[in-house]
Structures are given as C-alpha cells and as structure tokens.
C-alpha cells in the first residue's frame, strides 16, 4: 500500500513501501581449521618468502623443518619458527601430538603493507624505495 504525502509547494508525492530484508541463505558451517599459526608484517618481500614456501608446502612437518634448516634464504628461518609454533599449538590444543603424522596442509603468503622510503639522488631528485612486508599463514593437517 502506497502512501501519499503533500510537499511544501503543494505537489503530491507517492511513497512506495520499503521491501522487507531477505534473510541470508542457510550455508553449511565451515569446518574448524586444524592447528595453525600466522606471522604478520614479516620484513621479507612476499616473492622471496613464496620461493621458500613452495619448497615445503605439502611436506610432513619433520621433513619440512629439515629442509628449512639447510635452506640459505632468510625467509627459511622465519618459516621454520612458524611451523614449530603451529606444532606447539597442536600440542597445546590436542594434547600430545605425533609430529610424524602432521603435514603442512596450507601455507599462504600474502603481501603486507609497504614502507615507503626516499633515496636522495643527483641534482636534488629523490627515488622512492618500497620496503615490502609479508603476512604468512600455515595450517597443519594429518597425512591422508
């Protein structure tokens, strides 16, 4: 049913009723994530972290830590600590967990904010330098 209103100048305006809001469809609940850990604002470029992350994604945790121990890239040390943190989270939540059955299920590397700095150049110019950061997320699962 539409209502009519009169404006100050005498014109009539018809107001349409506002449709009722639709409820959200019933979606299945997301599965609870397994043991996980995250690292934010890592001061290594995401491209460099992804090179190391691609090496250990899908590996058993023990093998992944062994590979990272002998990887010379700076990101390897940070990823190793992150995986050990996820293992500790698994032990904290579920009691004693066998590391041999845990696998690096997901390992995502996203770009964080860039810190912009300026490098003085010749004749009064300045070039912008972007110091990139990364956000890393690791989730462990059981071997299938």
Swiss-Prot record:
Q: Which InterPro entries match?
A: Ribosomal_uL22, Ribosomal_uL22_bac/chlpt-type, Ribosomal_uL22_bac/org-type, Ribosomal_uL22_CS, Ribosomal_uL22_sf
SUPFAM superfamilies (alphabetical) = Ribosomal protein L22
GO annotation terms (biological process)? translation
**Where does the source fall among the domains of life?**
Bacteria
Provide the residue span(s) of the region labelled Disordered. Answer: 1-38
As one GO molecular function, the record gives: structural constituent of ribosome
Descriptive protein name: Large ribosomal subunit protein uL22
Taxonomic source organism: Anaeromyxobacter sp. (strain Fw109-5)
């Amino acid at each position: 049913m539409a209502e009519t209103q009169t404006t100050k100048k005498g014109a009539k305006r018809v107001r349409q009723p506002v449709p009722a809001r639709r409820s959200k469809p019933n979606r299945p609940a997301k599965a609870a994530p397994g043991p996980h850990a995250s690292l934010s604002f890592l001061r290594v470029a995401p491209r460099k972290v992804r090179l190391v992350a691609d090496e250990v994604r899908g590996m058993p945790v023990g093998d992944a830590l062994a590979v990272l121990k002998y990887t010379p890239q700076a990101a390897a040390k940070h990823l190793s600590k992150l995986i050990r943190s996820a293992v500790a989270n698994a032990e904290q939540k579920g009691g004693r967990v066998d590391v041999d059955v845990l696998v690096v299920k997901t390992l995502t590397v996203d770009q964080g904010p860039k810190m912009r700095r300026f490098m003085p150049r010749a004749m009064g110019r300045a070039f912008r330098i972007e110091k990139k950061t990364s956000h890393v997320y690791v989730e462990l699962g059981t071997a299938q």
